Amino acid sequence: MVKLHPGKEDLREGWMDSDNEMARRAGWSLTTERVINRPDGLDLDGLLTRLESSMSREVATVQWTMNYCLAEIGINFAEHRSRAIAIGEALGLFRDYPVSKGCTSPFAPIWIAEMVRRQS
């Protein structure tokens, strides 16, 4: 429902800095949606810096949505791909996440490489 709200950009920015874990998660979810669908004017370098500096300190539920954002930046923007992969490697989040046969790991470097491979 929020994704259709005309003021979602203000909500996105505010929620990313919220004290509430679920609001931060929603903020990162809206950010990922923007990365995928409307990246014009979005500071991708700034987002990568923020992900790199704060993702490891977040609670698991927020890390999951931040990781999704990191992966989508790496998948959709070749000029940011190596940095997104390097951040994923350095943080190591979801490196050992159990994955069913035939599924793609949520570990950002693996996820990015696989999605880029599928797109080519």
What are the roles of these predicted feature ranges?
Residues M1-S120:
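Alpha-helical scaffold domains
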